[in-house]
Amino acid sequence: NHARIYSEIDSADLVAIYDSDNDAAQKIASSYGGKVAKSIEEFVDLVDVVSVSTPTSTHRSIGEMLLNKRKHILIEKPIADTTDDAQALVNLAAEMGCVLQVGHIERFNPVLGEIEERLKDPRFIEVHRLSPFPNRSMDIGVVLDLMIHDLEIVLHLVKSKVVSIDAVGVPVLTKREDIANAR
């Protein structure tokens, strides 16, 4: 999806693609352009900005490698699977003078703009997300995979600091939480 979007932006050039699955990289390149890099090292030498859309458990190591090479990063959410890893990436980006942006795409959903126009000084917001089990992002639970969007939107709408959150999650289909509730 990232390659498709970049290919539609006039001011962006999709220069290179790297995927550990070379066939997937070839398919993306044939659809949207860009050179297929044979290694991550070759890829890093070709680009200025990188989209990281890998399993969350790899974000810190990949992010640190890219930031140490002074590459700007759009990293899929969540930024990391622990707050320590997230803070390490934020600190390194600042130290290197690089942009580190987390892909909270729901912030740019036109529906959110409509909600903002109608919602002035909210006192209570309740969000429910019901969906079939996605069979994706198996290295993290539903909170970091999907609920993070809902929490980010609520924080954006409320525009105040969090005082407290009460939450519970349970594993049902996997070893990580599949069902979660936060208040």
Q: Residues of each region from the PLM?
A:
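Active-site phosphate/pyrophosphate- and oxyanion-stabilizing loops and adjacent acidic/basic residues
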Residues: R4, Q26, E41, E64, ...
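Beta-loop-alpha module in the N-terminal Rossmann-like domain of NAD(P)-dependent dehydrogenases
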Residues: H2, Y32-V90
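Short, well-ordered coil/turn segments that N-cap beta-strands
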Residues: A12, D48, K71, M96-V99
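Conserved acidic residues
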Residues: V15, D48, R123
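Rossmann-like dinucleotide-binding domain that binds NAD(P)(H)
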Residues: P134-R183
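A contiguous active-site-proximal alpha/beta segment in oxidoreductase catalytic domains
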Residues: A80-S137
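Conserved SAM/SAH-binding loop
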Residues: K38-E41, R129, V170
